[in-house]
Design a protein with these regions (language model features):
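Flexible "arm" and connector segments at domain edges
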Residues: 1-100
Length: 100
């Protein structure tokens, strides 16, 4: 479990790095400039990429674990978790700011 959480943290750091070099204008952790709808769009996009991979794996061979496909699916799931974590960060920051 710890390894997975570390990978999610690394993905969050990667997202923030991409923001810092101008690839993104915001991340889901941004407290302004990004609506809840936009955050949901980002999360949904990541989910759909993972869903597409999972469905492709099922079509190719039910019950057969293709290592490359599983590795790619795992990568997408870590990205989903990181986007969700970023959104939680934004919510926490906004709650803290409203308290004080």
């Amino acid at each position: 479990m710890q390894r997975v959480l570390e990978e999610i943290a690394q993905e969050r750091a990667r997202q923030e790095h991409l923001l810092s070099i101008g690839k993104f204008t915001h991340t889901c952790a941004s407290i302004d400039g990004m609506s809840e709808h936009a955050r949901m769009t980002v999360l949904t996009e990541e989910y759909l990429e993972a869903d597409e991979l999972a469905r492709a794996m099922l079509r190719l061979a039910r019950g057969v674990n293709d290592r490359d496909e599983l590795t790619e699916l795992r990568k997408e799931l870590v990205q989903i978790a990181a986007v969700a974590a970023a959104w939680v960060e934004s919510i926490d920051t906004r709650i803290e700011l409203s308290e004080g």
